[in-house]
């Protein structure tokens, strides 16, 4: 999914198919706003860069999940060596690998 205007309008049908996945580290921060007032009420700020961002809900669910992803599932039809998988991360033996994000409630 490509973002062009930095806005995604949520609807009851938006998650009928599946999770929305935004790749290529396009997202650093996501906020949910109240439709009626425009007031911010929750968000996620990526402190480190994440390769992908998942946005999902059960169809007609009373919530929206905002998830920074440091990796993700295979693309449909991917049959290559795991080292060729997009978004793959590797830590050397003894190395510590961390990513940080903040959950913001307002």
Task: Enumerate the language-model features and the residues they cover.
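Glycine-rich active-site loops that engage anionic ligands at enzyme catalytic sites
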Residues: 33-74, 79
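Sterically constrained small-residue positions within well-ordered secondary structures
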Residues: 23, 46, 57, 90-92
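Active-site/ligand-binding surface loops and adjacent short beta/alpha elements
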Residues: 1-47
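Short alpha-helix capping/helix-loop boundary micro-motifs
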Residues: 81-88
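Context-gated lysine
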Residues: 2, 35, 60, 85, ...
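Short Pro-Gly-centered flexible turn/kink motifs
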Residues: 89-106
